[in-house]
Structures are given as structure tokens and as C-alpha cells.
């Protein structure tokens, strides 16, 4: 089937764009679309990405600090949770001596110059490093801007696997399961034994997401929804959490709406 689709696309000069785990892990991606269909709010990533953040530190003349910060933020820096434009700024003094053939922004060639500068620190996703460095070089007034990039061990809470969120109001387990069945047009869904609790906090993962069951339980979710759960995954969690399997395709069927909105 896949091969036939590829051949037909090539014959008709159609471009194919394929997104898999990148869209699974992205903010606004597969899991966010599922959460939207269910009606969840206060969304958080179940398993944040590790080793995906870096810190940028640069030094800018006081008079140009605002322009550099704005350029860095526009390029993707400074996002922490529900906050943007985040940075730390410390005033200090930079020194340099411009050699022959240079065109210094301030100071004279051959003379040691002292300039009041601001140390700007901010964070960014590692995949945006190239774009951010280009933005920095484009706006920084110095010919040779000084900047440092550090790897961070912080989890990137804005991207990762799975989502956990809350319903506006609690539902019984049967009410919730019936609504999920209708929303995702599922002929038959599987679930473990009902826990007897009402459903308010919901964890989910599109596709084969059973690997996130421990995280869903730790999050305090009342139910975990995913596309595939293996037979043995159902055992050992009786009374802990309601687990329901709606089908791999069914869980991701609304992903096309994401691309519709972009295109």
C-alpha cells in the first residue's frame, strides 16, 4: 500500500511530507490534537524530552541589549513553560583591542577599549541553535561577537511523549468511555476492569503508547488512553488506573487537521 501511494504521488508530481515521532513529541502535535478532541485543559507533557535544551550567553553593549534580546526571542529563545521572553541580564565591562583591518563598533584601532556591556543569558531548544546564532550575528553590533553555548540537563517540559490534562467536570467511567468511543468513531474499545472512580484527570498518547503507563500512573491520572496496549500490559494495575485502547489509526486520525491548518 505504501509503495503504491509513493509511486502514484511521484507520477502526479505530488510532494510527500512525512512526520512521525517529531510530530508526536511536538507542542501542538498529535497528542495535543487528541486532548483537544477530548476537551482537556491544563495540559502537561507526560515524559519531557531530555538533553534537548542549551543555554546561550552573549555580551552586548548596553545601548544594543534590547535589540539583541528581541532578536533572540524572535528566533526561539527564552521560552520556559507558559512564559516567554525569559532571560537573565547582568551589567559589566568588556575589554578588547581592535587590530589593523578591523572596523570596530566602538573604540580606536590599536588601543585597549573598555565598554559597558550586558551579559545576556537565555535558553533554547538545541535544534534551534543554528537559527539563533544566525539571528545573533545579524543583529549584534560587534564584528566578532562573544557568545558561549552550554548543554543543559534540564528536561524540556514543552516537548516529549504523551499528555496529561483535566476535564472541565468529572464523568463516570462509563460516560467517559462512551464519549471516547463516539468521538474517535471506534466500533469497539478495550479497557481493563473499571476502578469505580470518576474521571477528571486524563493521560493519553497517540499510537502505541503503553510504555508511558508508569508515567500516567505517577501523574495521578484517572484514565490512560492510547492506540495500542499489549495483552500483558493490562495486568498488575488493577484499581490503579483505568486503561483504554482505541486503536492506533483511530487515535491519530485527526492529525491531518494539524496539517490542514498549516497549509
Where do the PLM segments sit?
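Active-site catalytic microenvironments in core metabolic enzymes, especially phosphate/sugar-handling
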Residues: 1-263
